[in-house]
């Protein structure tokens, strides 16, 4: 077995897609799932309006999905102490460039301890993302 993708429910597919493209993701597939199939898979009442965009970055696939027939409810932003998936972590070559891409594509830097090691950002719809310099490495002392 292997992981296929991680799905992220969004309100505005194209706005969020542009944000992740600014961080190096590329679109590999876009689809509209027929209501009957979506109803059977998701247990939602028709009409569903299931649209998805699959984005890829270095082998990782992120599915952005929306359901026009079932608007997303207003919810508090998830944080690191809530149960369940907390964030997506993206390795970056240059922290300053990545932070600039976040800001210019509608996101926000929400925590930055300095030093260029890692920071936390939110996408245009509030999803928490960790930017980490290159690959996982020991946390700096101090």
Whereabouts are the PLM-identified features?
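Short solvent-exposed loop/turn micro-motifs enriched in small/polar/acidic residues
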Residues: 1, 46-48, 112-114
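N-terminal beta-strand motif that seeds the catalytic metal site of vicinal oxygen chelate
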Residues: 1-18, 23-33, 85-92, 135-142
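Core segments of cupin and vicinal oxygen chelate
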Residues: 9-59, 97
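Vicinal oxygen chelate
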Residues: 30-32, 62, 90, 96-142
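A cross-kingdom feature marking solvent-exposed beta-strand/loop segments within repeated
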Residues: 36-39, 71-75, 110
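A short helix-loop-beta-strand connector motif used in the catalytic cores of GNAT acetyltransferases and
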Residues: 47-51, 84, 116-117
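Active-site-proximal beta-strand elements of phosphoester/diester hydrolases
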Residues: 64-66
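Long, charged/polar, surface-exposed segments that mediate recognition or autoinhibition
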Residues: 76, 81
